[in-house]
Amino acid sequence: MDSAPPSPSPSPAPAYAELHCLTNFSFQRGASHPEELVARAAEAGYTALAITDECSLAGVVRAHQQLRRLARPLKLLIGSELRLVDGLRVVLLATDRAAYGRLARLITIGRRAATKGRYQLTCADLDRGIPGCLALVVPPDDRILDAAALVADARWVGERFPDAAWLAVELACGPDDGRRLEALLAIASAAGLPPVAATGALMHDPSRRALADVLAALRLRVTIAEAGRALAPNAERALHERAVLARRYPAELLAETLRIVARCHFRLDELRYEYPAELVPDGETPASWLRRLVEDGLRWRHGRPQDDLAPPKVRAQVEHELALIAELGFEAYFLTVEDLVRFARGRGILCQGRGSAANSVICWALGITEVDPELGIMLVERFISKERDEPPDIDVDFEHERREEVIQYVYRKYGRERAALAATVIRYRARSALRDVGRALGLPPGQLERLARDRFWFDAGRIRPERLREAGFDPASPGVQRLATLTEALVGFPRHLSQHVGGFVIARGRLDELVPVENAAMPERTVIQWDKDDLDALGLLKIDVLALGMLSALRRSLALVSTWRGRPFTLADIPREAPEVYRMLSEADSIGVFQIESRAQMTMLPRLKPARFYDLVVQVAIVRPGPIQGGMVHPYLQARARIERDEPVSYPQPHCPDADADGTCVPRPDDVRRVLERTLGVPIFQEQVMQLAVVAAGFTPGEADQLRRAMGAFRRHGELERYRAKLLAGMAARGYRAEFAERLCDQIEGFGSYGFPESHAASFALLVYCSAWLKCCEPAAFLCGLLNSQPMGFYAPSQLIQDARRHGVVVLGAEVTASDWDCTLEALPDASPGAAPAVRLGLQLVKGFGREAAMRIVAARTERPFPNVDELALRARLDAAALKRLAEAGALEPLAGHRRQALWQAAAGHAPEGVLRGARIAEPRAELAAPSEAQELVADYARLGFTLGRHPLALLRAKLTTLRFVTAAEIRDYPDRKLARIAGLVTCRQRPGTAKGTLFLTVEDETGLANVIVQAELVERQRREVLGARLLGVFGQIRSKGQVVHLLAQRLVDHSALLGALEARSRDFQ
């Protein structure tokens, strides 16, 4: 006679561990963040929580960090749920470090066997078991179980995981729970596996059930209404109170969870990372080889191959850094970065380190960074120190068009089993969340798209009723309200893993035993399942192999200058501190210049008036959220104004300049002055904050670095508050006034919004100066470099070309008889010796025209010129589509005449195929009327995105004048507060995070650019005009201060209809 199933646990709240839990890193399955699940398990008093995302360890570090923050007696188990191709579903839990490595490698095998976002594992992959891992067989959710098949599966798992396998009993408070429990206990008995309680949790709280339904519908590519039984029947797949579980599960099943926990000892803290060692030659140690390279680098830097002429201060810093690196064991890290930089330079690839690494004289000696230690701004503790609980971080920028060469070098040198890129977590933002929720709810696609197009990245809050009405939705409808609520809930959820912009992790042993590796979307790329924050949290080293478009533009520009001058010209040949460069920048003439071409930077330039290199360092750093929100900008500008008036800058002084009896107060009167003198008494950089904490508040250098880290975490975790009291007390003890102490704390808090290290700003300032010199002194080559390196920068080719022409650069159109693929320099006919070159636009600017076709044109033209379109098509093997694109761009004009004529010939002149291939077929030439100027403009913008003819608004000026619009040039001379109205093509839209909802527009007419400020209230009231207009009329009031002129918008009018078919696109929210 069969025994009755065990009764529920008699204890009201027995001890329990959840062994099967999915986070939202099981994409489109889990409905809670890892942090929420850990917090909920701790709150419910669980003994342990296992994070078991599907074929993934992507969420475990976040769970680990949350547990650290909570400091609660909850044990975190690491595992993964695997759904095999054969139908078996199993959860594996790692018991120790070796088992964790095997699990990570198994996940890697599954992920590498499939395309991005998928995995493929079979029973064969588990045939020998996974030593050290515990296995839970998870029955299907079917109401009627196939007992025989499940017994067979459970036995199979039990044989491969002897004494380490269980049958998971998951009950969901359904009407069949009793029958399901009885059946699962019988199956466990027949298979010889102990049963264990589990929830298969998808969310931390039942309130996430609606969101879980949305995710399930998205995964199945159906609406919620169509999903039917594929949706969970209730909200029970959550982390419940233990008392609830006690009523649901027999006591022995709950107790079994604790026996499993007792066998799991692995913690993520056990992960240890060793850097590659093969870069060290025989007979050398990492320390000795690094020292040799540094000594060679110092001699190279100082231009003396034999002697050591390093200044004593630099020599002392070298010895200090080498000792510190040796003590912390980071020699191999520096050697690896040096090897990548050496490879790049050997290939002629421009590169430069940046970030905190520019504080290191070792990085400078190795050629990784370019900031000269003689500048006197290096603070090595910002980069590496004994008290830092994190590894150093070296970021190196490479030319964006050639970075792939460096990436593939890493893969070749270390192998894919040891090197991979870090991940980036792509999260739902306002627009993507709205679209996906609306799709799951089955809302009308047309209305949904209208609403989605009106949402931007900054729309993180609830959808405003007026936006819903404009899209045709009723804001009072329960379904629409559900859309708004679920969209808000989904924003911030991970959507998928992408690849980091360049963060490489390279290991001495197998990387996939440290973290799973999967295929990236790009061919020949592999990505780990952890992102930058995960790596930092575990103290794992990475190298940032980053891409920077300006480096490509500089190399291309310098190559053109070299060719034009007939001798090599490099960055080292650019004259330093050229006065004409600073005059240009002080007039906000910086379109195309690295880092200082944005609206905010251009507004700052005439106020700051840079006159030397260090001014550029400040310029780069001061227009950042940290200094702005910390209130540093106006005090700094006021200090500069005092200097111009020969007035002194005051610095805070302690009231006890000498040590007292017990030695408590020992600051020197000029301590603060030495820190702040170069920024005129105002802290602009993170390093200055750290130095002030040391000299004014008594922090150790390591404590000061902890303060710096707390600045970065302030917005997320409020970690800065615990340092505030220490700062205030330390400064009071050293005799500084409370006013200065409070102001410094407020400024430090501002840095929580993102401020630059001084070393990073100095690295960027080098590129600012070089690009500014090229713009000022070699404008034609600079324009070519920028155009040949697109897409990059702040401005589209149209604005770059217009700006260069305003500076006197002659720009010649793209033509098949003269153009290469790239833009080139060309001597003008009858030009005098030494005259500036013109720019010949390249065929790459013709939208839709391919590089291979362009190279065939150049090769054929090199043999002999093209007499006509037919010959061009024949010899360059161009099809009708390619000829049509060239004709539409005006590139056939030298052979065919105007566009209509060219289009006619293109239609008839493509190279014959088949039996007629290579044959010359003569057709009569038609004579067509030339297109009007307006038609030419429309065609230019359609195929090129710009025009070399008159500006579109020049053709509309008469109409705009009747509407009483003035030009951009006219308002530059208007007095402050004068009412004005202008109309222009919208070239860019910006919304800085520090602007409190204000939007900044740049509009362009035939006379230049105008800056428009649209305050938050007007943005919401006239959202369609602000975000959708191509030709915008602005009614407003002038805001003028010196050379800086803005128009504060009061009313906006969309005049895009005046443009007709002309396509003018803007670069928005760059």
UniProtKB/Swiss-Prot annotation:
Cell compartment(s), UniProt:
Cytoplasm
Answer yes or no on keyword Nucleotidyltransferase.
yes
What SUPFAM superfamilies does UniProt report for this protein, alphabetically? PHP domain-like
The UniProt record lists the keyword DNA damage:
yes
Q: Any idea of its EC number? A: 2.7.7.7
Where would you say this protein principally sits, based on its record? cytoplasm
* Reactions that this protein is recorded to catalyse: DNA(n) + a 2'-deoxyribonucleoside 5'-triphosphate = DNA(n+1) + diphosphate
The similarity annotation says: Belongs to the DNA polymerase type-C family. DnaE2 subfamily.
Q: What is this protein called?
A: Error-prone DNA polymerase
- Name the source organism: Aromatoleum aromaticum (strain DSM 19018 / LMG 30748 / EbN1)
Traced from the root, the source organism's taxonomic lineage reads: Bacteria, Pseudomonadati, Pseudomonadota, Betaproteobacteria, Rhodocyclales
